Amino acid sequence: MNWNNVEDLAKGFMSDIVQASGGLARYQIIQRIDVDGFPAKVDGYYYDAQTYLDVLRGATPPYVPQETDYYAIINRFNILELVAKNEIDEVWIFSFPHAGFYESIMGGPGAFWCNAPPLKKTDAAKRRFVMMGFSYERGVGEMLENMGHRAESIMEKTFEKLSGDNNLWKRFIRYEKTHPGKAAVGSIHFAPNSEKDYDWNNPSSVLSECDDWLYNFPNFKGVTRIVSSNEWGHGDTRKHHVWWLKHLPKTAGRKNGIHNNWWQYIMNPNHMRA
């Protein structure tokens, strides 16, 4: 299989995150473990090499249930202990099609939905942590999409008790189809002018508040500008996601008890109360 090199993916992803966050979010990989084997499914099943190749070739359907046994991985690699000792903050798992990993999942005391149901019985970690599921069949753009959904889940939780215009997250993700004339930055799936999921190459022009978010947050000045897909790469997944992540607020101060630097929540969910 002509799949991507894990180191190249990791370097590209980390570089994009540094750029998008204005240098605030910097990953450091402290250990890499290469596992020669297939992960266990939730019912204990393991693929063997021939069966898996048959699945890839379409000769046999993928095994069901597809979900991986996260607890087997957590126990095998002492994840809870490492998090509790502050030796690691999160875990990245690079795998192959049909491996059964979520794009992201959260564990630890007070863990909440992070594009997947929270991992129960992981309080021994003593703090929240995220496990990212990446695929070396895909590219950096898809890694950024996983990160984008993680950001969406965490910011949705962060602002859940605020309503109306006080819920700045809801304002951030507005796009033209749902809020005519009031498009902001959109979501990871919906650009300001998108008509449907993944519609990042839509050439139509719409009025957007994206510059107000990028340059003036939290002291909005009512700045708007006409934008279209040329702003975020004409449908290029990676370019759109960098553009979107770049617009996430990253300034000092607080409003309604919530930090104006959203990256600190996204990178470390222990900064928020659940």
Predicted regions and their residues:
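Auxiliary, metal-adjacent structural segments of Zn-dependent hydrolase domains
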Residues: 77-120
